[in-house]
Amino acid sequence: MFNKILVVCVGNVCRSPTAERLLKRFHPSLTVASAGLGALVGKGADPAAASVASAHDLSLENHCARQISARLCREYDLILTMEKRHIAALCDIAPEMRGKVMLFGHWDSEREIPDPYRKSRDAFEAVYTLLERSARQWAQALNAEQGKP
């Protein structure tokens, strides 16, 4: 059973905080957090990510970027990454995590979700759409696992 989920990207200021909040929206009973492989530790959400999320009635307020660690990984049942290379990096940090690390876009044909950092608002909108779709798919899969419709 996956009750505690960690979402991981690079800086922990664009994709993973948005994905974290979307998963919480679609499956409120989960414990969801986020972290970065090269986190901009202590920073809030990227202003463009926050603006796009806000336009979709999703708040990234009070987000604070944090660095991934082996210890942090061990606290979660499932770790979701944005790119395949993130899975490899996490397995280097904590090899014992290999069986519980998957792509956030797993249910969307194993889709990798590109990094919009320092790109156009259109790039952030496109990434938001991918994140929202994948978050809905994860929520459905997790509900099915728990025997919920």
Swiss-Prot record:
The keyword Cell membrane does not apply. Pathway: Glycan metabolism; exopolysaccharide biosynthesis. Gene3D superfamilies: 3.40.50.2300. It is an enzyme of class 3 (hydrolase). CDD domains: LMWPTP. The active site is at 9 (nucleophile), 15, 115 (proton donor). One of its GO terms (biological process) is polysaccharide biosynthetic process. Belongs to the low molecular weight phosphotyrosine protein phosphatase family. This is Low molecular weight protein-tyrosine-phosphatase Wzb. The gene is wzb.
